[in-house]
Regions:
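Vicinal oxygen chelate
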Residues: 1-9, 31-77, 86-114, 125-129
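Conserved active-site tyrosine of GNAT-family acetyltransferases
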Residues: 20-25, 89, 118
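Short, conserved charged micro-motifs
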Residues: 19, 81-86
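Short, glycine-anchored, charge-dense loop/turn motifs used at functional sites
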Residues: 115-121
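Conserved beta-strand-loop-alpha-helix junction that forms the acyl-donor binding cleft
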Residues: 14-16, 105
Length: 129
């Protein structure tokens, strides 16, 4: 038996729900597609290219956020020009955690950054296989 699964958003639990939602909107260009604030705080966001994330209140989910730089699940995105993206990110107060570095075998640029709460995000350029 094969059970069909479908994509949904990757969810991040935020210590400061509104601040993290605003950062993903202002810095990375995500748009709010759904917002729930009555019984709990949860926001669905999506980029014009179709990347979906969800942000929820960690406190309401009874989760105490730890050192997020050690997360074993990492969001990865692609941009056309990594140097240009990192310049934008730095100007907007983002934190580049590594890179940009060039992968010689497959000839693409890669790096990483963290959002204001320390969630790691990996970035590759359009040449990444």
């Amino acid at each position: 038996m094969v059970i069909e699964i479908r994509p949904r958003e990757t969810v991040m639990l935020a210590a400061d729900f509104q601040a993290l939602v605003t950062w993903y909107q202002d810095v990375l260009g995500f748009a709010v597609t759904d917002l729930f604030e009555d019984d709990y705080h949860y926001c669905c966001l999506e980029t014009p290219s179709g990347i979906k994330i969800g942000i929820a209140s960690a406190e309401e989910m009874e989760v105490e956020p730890a050192d997020r730089s050690t997360n074993t699940v990492v969001l990865q995105i692609e941009v056309d020009d990594l140097a240009e993206f990192f310049a934008h990110l730095t100007e907007a107060g983002g934190t580049v955690t590594f890179g940009p570095s060039f992968e010689k075998t497959n000839e693409f640029w890669f790096g990483g950054f963290s959002d204001p709460e320390g969630n790691p995000v990996w970035v590759v350029d359009k040449n990444c296989p």
